[in-house]
């Protein structure tokens, strides 16, 4: 089963828009992108479970039942004080196995190529600014994809 979610979906008790840049919020862009991916999955009749726009990440993680054959994917947009910062990055758990690493690499390679931006590669959650990500505790292949930099207008176009 594929589990797909939009980071900072702007809902819940504490609204977190995520990164902001170039007139966009991360929350809105991740929902928009997630919905595009869902449309593709539906068209190909691929089964999936998605987060709801009215639930926080903790509620979503409580609701889903991942297993070893699961793929868990969450979309985000990166940001920087430097408007020239560019690229796509995949994040994996600190205890990631070879399947997590291979999936994350394929995903970031394809994303960077398709968008024509820098490939920033695969990093562990420990290398992220948060250090530890709740999503990474799920079973199966788990990846958080930073699609591009919301702060770089070229990345967004």
Predicted regions, residues:
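Polar, enzyme-active/binding microenvironments
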Residues: 40-43, 72, 76, 88, ...
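Catalytic cores of processing enzymes, dominated by hydrolases/peptidases
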Residues: 60, 96-149
């Amino acid at each position: 089963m594929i589990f797909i979610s939009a980071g900072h979906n702007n809902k819940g008790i504490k609204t977190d828009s995520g990164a902001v840049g170039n007139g966009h919020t991360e929350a809105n862009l991740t929902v928009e992108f997630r919905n595009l991916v869902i449309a593709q999955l539906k068209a190909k009749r691929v089964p999936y479970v998605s987060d709801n726009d009215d639930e926080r990440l903790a509620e979503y993680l409580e609701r889903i039942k991942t297993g070893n054959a699961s793929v868990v994917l969450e979309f985000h947009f990166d940001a920087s004080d430097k408007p020239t910062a560019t690229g796509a990055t995949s994040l994996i758990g600190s205890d990631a196995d070879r399947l997590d690493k291979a999936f994350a690499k394929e995903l970031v390679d394809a994303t960077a190529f398709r968008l024509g931006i820098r490939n920033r590669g695969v990093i562990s959650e420990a290398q992220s600014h948060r250090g530890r990500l709740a999503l990474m505790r799920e079973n199966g292949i788990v990846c958080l994809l930073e699609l591009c930099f919301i702060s770089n207008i070229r990345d967004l176009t």
